Amino acid sequence: MPRERGEKVVATNRKARHDYTIESTYEAGLVLTGTEVKSLRQGRASLVDGYAFVDAGEAWLDAVHIPEYNQGTWNNHPVRRKRKLLLHKEQILKIHSKVKEGGYTVVPLQLYFVDGRAKVELAIAKGKKEYDKRQTLRERQDKREADRAMSSHRRLGE
């Protein structure tokens, strides 16, 4: 029987959508060592401080925390290291031009497996000011209250 295909999400960066306005997203492959893959399969990773950058025509992911593999020996990987991203050349150039434009950064949103291969969802994002964050929270809260009022009205109206 053929294996089931699908995604297994390992880590998400929930703070990114709060701190940044997302412009566009890309899916990139990761160049990892064996112990990093095994540690990710255990669901252990943190994207909170992570960011991506372009250097000499290559994309890199930095400050992503993948803890050491529990059963690893002396051959374990460093916890925080630069990891190469696998993207098409056009995508790298688009990312580089946006970041060079100013005010933009590249943040990881999600780390997951697709058919056994580790992928990361990257976002070109612009930092939010404090008042933007408050306004977003206010809008979300107003929407939640309106939905709650509508659902209670529907229940009482029936």
UniProtKB/Swiss-Prot annotation:
Keyword Transit peptide in record: no
Domain of life: Bacteria
Annotated GO CC locations: cytosol
SUPFAM superfamilies, per database record: Small protein B (SmpB) (SSF74982)
Gene3D superfamilies linked: 2.40.280.10
Keywords in alphabetical order: Cytoplasm, RNA-binding
A UniProt-annotated Pfam family: SmpB
Region (Disordered) location: 131-158
GO molecular function: RNA binding
TM region(s), chain numbering: none
Subcellular localization: Cytoplasm
InterPro entries reported in the protein's UniProt record: SmpB, SsrA-bd_prot, SsrA-bd_prot_CS
One Gene Ontology term from the biological process aspect of the record: trans-translation
Similarity comment: Belongs to the SmpB family.
Role summary: Required for rescue of stalled ribosomes mediated by trans-translation. Binds to transfer-messenger RNA (tmRNA), required for stable association of tmRNA with ribosomes. tmRNA and SmpB together mimic tRNA shape, replacing the anticodon stem-loop with SmpB. tmRNA is encoded by the ssrA gene; the 2 termini fold to resemble tRNA(Ala) and it encodes a 'tag peptide', a short internal open reading frame. During trans-translation Ala-aminoacylated tmRNA acts like a tRNA, entering the A-site of stalled ribosomes, displacing the stalled mRNA.
Cross-referenced NCBIfam families: PRK05422.1, smpB
Protein name: SsrA-binding protein
Species of provenance: Clavibacter michiganensis subsp. michiganensis (strain NCPPB 382)
